[in-house]
């Protein structure tokens, strides 16, 4: 996906990028590749691949959810900033918090935010399991997002405790999401969530399947969740 295709395909979806926003994506790409030489941020470094598989793929969430309001967003395990930083570039009014367990990725994100001149962004070096217990952040976000971090039964325990009641958990998945949903339904129920919508589409050019799940937070999450670091992965909430 070259820059012209990136721009026009977003335009088709009603997302018009200014020259400043296009410049921010250019800086993002250059910074990602530069830092990737000294630490492992991504296996994808070829320009057209980054624009497709990182930038465009992250923004696809906005094809199925309206980001036009100044929502507070928490991105769990964002790594090099996906999906929340590409969304922040497109929708500058968003208030973004990224939680990542690796300090060197947080260092990269702090540097990136300076280079992109982003405001209303916060980067927290923490495990989602401990972050989700903290007063002031627990059940405080309009939207919590994660892209391909873990299977749904595990991911729900990391993300739903952070979503305010009435808010949305957006899980961005690859193929075979149906099986994940089936296995994850019980966890959603236990944690206070309900699957509202699942959208399946093909990522352009490479035609690989993507699924975006919109999960509404219906009830408060029981206090015992999230459990201790590592437990959700070892003992997922499944029947």
Curated annotation (Swiss-Prot):
InterPro entries associated with the record: rRNA_ssu_MeTfrase_G, SAM-dependent_MTases_sf
A matching Pfam family: GidB
CDD domains, per the entry: AdoMet_MTases
Sequence positions that bind S-adenosyl-L-methionine: 77, 82, 128-129, 147
GO CC entries: cytosol
Superkingdom: Bacteria
EC top class, as a word: transferase
Subcellular location(s) per record: Cytoplasm
Keywords noted in UniProt: Cytoplasm, Methyltransferase, rRNA processing, S-adenosyl-L-methionine, Transferase
GO molecular function, one term: rRNA (guanine-N7-)-methyltransferase activity
E.C. no: 2.1.1.-
NCBIfam families the UniProt entry points to: rsmG_gidB (TIGR00138)
Function: Specifically methylates the N7 position of guanine in position 535 of 16S rRNA.
Family membership noted in the UniProt record: Belongs to the methyltransferase superfamily. RNA methyltransferase RsmG family.
Protein name: Ribosomal RNA small subunit methyltransferase G
Species of origin: Bacillus cereus (strain ATCC 14579 / DSM 31 / CCUG 7414 / JCM 2152 / NBRC 15305 / NCIMB 9373 / NCTC 2599 / NRRL B-3711)
Gene name for this UniProt entry: rsmG
